Regions:
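Surface-exposed, low-hydrophobicity segments enriched in Gly/Pro/acidic/Ser residues
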Residues: 1-199
Length: 199
């Protein structure tokens, strides 16, 4: 199976890329001109991804998220071949933590497939794919795990009906004040191999 990482943007891919709903291009103010920035997204392209396997990218960062209330992300999924993947067969996975193995929060969202060929923003960026997580809930997962007396070194899943389709998990002892790495990945939930591109 193959895994490719790339970029898609409004200037080079205007035939298939549109701004997410409600997003405007940033403007760079010069001394005599105003220039619009090139809005873009990272792409993860998986080919023949086996059942329950994950492919992901990560970035080392250093950020304190305590001053923020929400984490928002727009997600797009499209088949590499026509009718090659259906809604909810793939799940986007976002990990935030001190590291990616022992101390992290994990957010999962099942992906809806975008309407092929459409340039309507809500077709390209289905509302059901919007990740909108209240960061306070991530801290509450650790408390719920401790109350449940669950092992700290195992992935704990929060049972929360107010998170919609989001699945929130925690492992170890991450803290929002010391996020050192972030991961974005995709998992195949289908018994069949799947090929798709995720933005």
């Amino acid at each position: 199976n193959d895994f490719e990482v790339g970029l898609v943007n409004i200037e080079q891919n205007e035939g298939r890329y549109v701004l997410p709903p409600g997003i405007e291009r940033e403007r760079l103010q010069g001394s005599t001109t105003v220039q619009q920035q090139n809005e873009q997204s990272v792409t993860l392209k998986v080919t023949n991804l086996p059942q329950d396997k994950v492919r992901a990218i990560y970035k080392n960062i250093s950020v304190d998220l305590r001053r923020y209330k929400e984490l928002k992300m727009f997600l797009h999924a499209e088949p590499v071949i026509v009718n090659g993947v259906d809604d909810d067969e793939l799940t986007a996975i976002i990990r935030l933590g001190t590291d990616l193995n022992d101390n992290f929060y994990q957010i999962e969202i099942p992906l809806k497939i975008s309407i092929y060929g459409s340039l309507a923003p809500l077709d390209v960026w289905p509302e059901a794919n919007n990740l909108d997580a209240t960061l306070e809930k991530l801290g509450k997962i650790k408390l719920a795990r401790d109350v449940a007396n669950a092992p700290i070194n195992e992935l704990f899943t929060a049972s929360s009906s107010d998170s919609g389709e989001l699945v929130l998990r925690v492992k170890g002892n991450p803290t929002l004040s010391q996020i050192r790495t972030i991961m974005l990945g995709v998992r195949n939930n289908s018994p069949l191999e799947k090929s798709a591109e995720i933005w």
